Amino acid sequence: MASTVIELDEKKRIIQEFVPGKQVTLCHVIASPDYSLYGKLGLIDARGAIGIMTITPSEAAMIAADVSTKAAAVEIGFVDRFNGSLVITGDVAAVEAALRSVMQVLCDMMGYSPAPMTKT
């Protein structure tokens, strides 16, 4: 996604553009989040690891959500088909398995460019 800032009459306008292509731009596991992070993210009843993905085109987040819940015992914390964001929660092994399955479908089957899965 590219961003452009335009200043008109001392007002800033930010325009965000998605470039053509199919790409997983982020695939990350937070293995042991601080308890306060759940509330800050709106994950009120969540426990365990948090998995985060961003995908272009953004509609693929719906596919990622479907694949992740079928692949492992994870819960959808958030999915945004307009921005391509997916947040899942579960135990570390389940979150990692779910993200690997999503990467397999999107990258191996559908030709998306992969991002490395990272973990903190």
Model-based region annotation:
Residues 1-65, 69-82, 89-92, 96-120:
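Positively charged, small/polar-rich N-terminal and surface patches that mediate targeting and assembly
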